[in-house]
């Protein structure tokens, strides 16, 4: 029998990203010649998540968006790591003092300070903060952790395939069902789109999207009034409150009593699922994405939302 030399999708992804990475100034040389552990600073949440997943403890991280100073799920690994400010405004002085070998940044957040970062250290500059597979693969290549990254991507694809099959069984005859991801804020609702972090995971699982979500651009839609609720009407809702405040909870309490809400399919069918805002909206990495799968698995195993 001739051995199958076809690259697994995760291997192809990692190889393509790794080759692109080696073309970046300084990165390929640092990764290939350095044998001791890199001193790495991560300037966005998904990079911190990915470093932990790869078994690397950064020498510096930025503050989390909530559950400050660091998300609870990352605290066991990062509790003792120094902080270098906010994701949107990292402290260059603190970064210099930590003497990093590699800074992982995002063009979306850090384009303006990129020339200054490059004077401090080699910089791995990713485009977005929520493309978790690309972040994982590129960081794995930059830190000589290609094998670990490949294994994590393979585990992810196997888990997605299994969960997709469970969802197809649960919603037999109706699959793919439509989905909306709703963030209940103090004075409005955000509906996350296929291009968002959560949206990319749901699309990979095979969920369908509402017409409004398919036609929209960007990562979210803002619904300023309850009268806009029919726009997000879907078979299943995943909802969370990114702002953990009394005002956001009050808005949610009013929302579920509104006649328009009660006429939507998901509430009528008891398919409204409360999920973790950090995992679904703020984590941006492979560990956070797997926490999403944990919660979606509950949907596949249950008859209705509690």
Predicted regions and their residues:
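N-terminal secretory signal peptides
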Residues: 1-13, 20-24, 31-32
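C-terminal segment of N-terminal export signals and the immediately downstream linker at the start
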Residues: 26-42, 46
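Structured C-terminal subdomain patch of bacterial secreted/periplasmic proteins
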Residues: 38, 239-306
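A short, structured surface patch at a secondary-structure boundary
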Residues: 39, 47-97
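Basic- and aromatic-lined ligand-binding clefts that recognize polyanionic substrates
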Residues: 39-54, 151-212
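Proline-aspartate-enriched helix->loop->beta-strand connector
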Residues: 99-103, 234
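Extracytoplasmic substrate-binding proteins
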Residues: 113-187, 271, 279-306
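Ligand-binding pocket segment of bilobal, Venus flytrap-like solute-binding proteins
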Residues: 217-246
